[in-house]
Regions:
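Catalytic donor-sugar/metal-binding loop of nucleotide-sugar-dependent glycosyltransferases
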Residues: 73
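Terminal amphipathic alpha-helical/low-complexity segments used for targeting or macromolecular assembly
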Residues: 1-19, 25, 31
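Conserved, surface-exposed functional patches that form binding/active-site neighborhoods
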Residues: 117
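Left-handed beta-helix
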Residues: 18, 23-24, 29-30, 35-36, ...
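Phosphate/pyrophosphate-binding betaalpha-module
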Residues: 52
Length: 117
């Protein structure tokens, strides 16, 4: 049904709503949860290997972006969020209704507040 390649990491498989869209080349590894009607675009990497990634509903992660975690920080992306092309979202929190611009880098421990651009 999906067009993505999911990878089990240390016995943990991604949990993905059936209404999520995956473009060709997207890669999902480990402890990743994605809410309904979200979209993961071409060549995105979601790497929940050493901690977890949670992506809310109606969120889109655009082409060539990377979402990763750290040992001491998970990554949480809320509902109705856009992560622009070529962005890196690493071990941080992005609250609901945010826009992370193309090429942006958000690093460990950062909190992007609700409605931020």
């Amino acid at each position: 049904m999906f067009t993505y390649k999911d990878v089990i990491f240390e016995g943990t498989q991604p949990q993905i709503d059936e209404k999520v869209y995956f473009a060709k080349g997207a890669r999902i590894v480990g402890r990743v949860t994605i809410g309904e009607y979200s979209s993961i675009w071409h060549n995105v990497v979601l790497r929940g290997d050493v901690n977890s990634i949670s992506i809310g509903r109606y969120t889109n992660i655009q082409d060539n972006s990377v979402v990763h975690v750290a040992d001491n920080y998970s990554t949480k992306i809320g509902d109705f969020v856009t992560v622009g092309h070529n962005a890196t979202v690493h071990a941080c929190t992005v609250e609901d209704h945010c826009l992370i611009g193309m090429g942006s880098v958000v690093l460990d421990g950062a909190v992007i507040g609700r409605g931020s651009i």
